[in-house]
């Protein structure tokens, strides 16, 4: 995946994900001047021990570097986790559009974060069934911990975000009776203080 993004930044070609699920086991850096889209909402999933430490969170996708200007367009994707990854920041957004020439050219359109509740996440009703009669502890919730954060927009960054949503599953989508489930996620979206406009 990293080589594909690096190549696209040089060639100007659009990165196109065929429909399917793609596992990411360490940070992928998205350079500026990349356009990314998918067929029928392919799924990009953070998984593995690299993302296991909630005291040392790491991004799955790191878009640009802090203070970097450029264009990145992401559309028609779903971001998930496979298994508990309490140290995963699903997207770290570092890039800022050069608003003098290309206002709102760094952004995410029609892409969504969905944590648990669906096939392949390993965070479903067979593991994380809601049980209101049981006291939950950090240890007992370990197998049902989603991510550290869905989206972190860092200082000096900005973006245009349209038709995006984040959902930490409260019920099953793909198994049996679609009962309620308990998934524990650290944060949703943090937009650090910036003097740049975001939309």
What is each PLM-predicted segment?
Residues 1-199:
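Extracellular/periplasmic carbohydrate-active domains that bind, remodel
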């Amino acid at each position: 995946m990293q080589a594909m993004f690096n190549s696209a930044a040089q060639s100007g070609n659009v990165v196109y994900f065929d429909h399917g699920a793609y596992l990411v086991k360490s940070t992928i850096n998205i350079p500026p001047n990349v356009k990314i889209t998918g067929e029928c909402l392919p799924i990009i999933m953070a998984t593995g021990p690299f993302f296991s430490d909630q005291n040392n969170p790491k991004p799955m996708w790191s878009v640009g570097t802090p203070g970097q200007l450029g264009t990145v367009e992401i559309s028609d994707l779903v971001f998930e986790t496979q298994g508990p990854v309490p140290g995963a920041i699903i997207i770290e957004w570092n890039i800022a559009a050069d608003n003098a020439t290309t206002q709102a050219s760094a952004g995410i359109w029609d892409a969504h974060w969905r944590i648990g509740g669906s096939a392949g996440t390993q965070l479903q009703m067979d593991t994380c069934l809601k049980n209101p009669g049981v006291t939950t502890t950090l240890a007992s919730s370990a197998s049902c911990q989603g991510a550290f954060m869905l989206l972190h927009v860092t200082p000096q960054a900005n973006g245009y975000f349209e038709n995006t949503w984040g959902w930490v599953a409260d019920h099953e989508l793909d198994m049996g009776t679609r009962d309620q489930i308990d998934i524990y996620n650290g944060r949703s979206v943090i937009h650090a203080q910036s003097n740049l406009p975001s939309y």
